[in-house]
Amino acid sequence: MSLTYKIASTIVRLIGVKKMFLKNKEEMLEYAKGENAKVVFDLEKAKARATRKNYYLFDMDVMGYRLISYQKNQTPADGAVLYLFGGGMITQPNKLDFKLSERIMEQTGKDVWFLFYPLCSENVKIDKTYEVSFEAYRLMTETYKAENISVLGFSSGACLSLGIFLHNNAIGRPLSMPGKIISVSPGGIPDVTVDENKEIWEKLKELNHKDVMIDPTYIKTAREIAKGDEDIPEYMLDGTVGDFTDFPKTYFYFG
């Protein structure tokens, strides 16, 4: 365990981040509502920044949800990155996500498609998130060869980076797989009330004292938010039960 980690974990414990994940469904959604009311993206300001920095920013629509494309040139590049932000499926991206998207475009020469995917709430469940994310990838394959597309996701977005293609396999593989998937800190929200997952629940409780961020209780709360009373395919909630047949080279990062 590095000194940097020890310092960071101590700070996280002291500021009480973990307490937030003890909130119930209603409290968590109220918290998310407040976070999502903040203005984190202004299209006109973003376009002005693109002009100053000599690149192009395009605003698109995917099933009623915004998608912005960072491009070095007015015409599409040979390859692209689908950027899926993190936020537990309930909170919007932050300003660092946009800066990183810009940086990826500048350093790789690839276009970056940034999807504002549907967030889970009382009225929107995770199957809608998958539907829109899958459609965004389908649209990408109309512009770029699938092998020239990389899919990058963080946290809940990392779950989507895998889940889009678990979904593709589940519905008969209508789309070609991307060239690579980069999944940073993916998780899952298995049903810990069923017998086959009891061991997972016991391990979560056993490791709780080591986890400086998330209390095991949140697994149940997050599942309640994402699923509600809907009949949702289990792979959308717990990617470990999905079909990984013919997946491309996939990079996992944790920490």
Q: Model regions: which residues?
A:
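A glycine/proline-hinged amphipathic helix-loop "lid/cap" segment
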Residues: 1-73, 217-220
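Alpha/beta-hydrolase superfamily serine-hydrolase fold, recognizing
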Residues: 7, 57-59, 63-68, 72-255
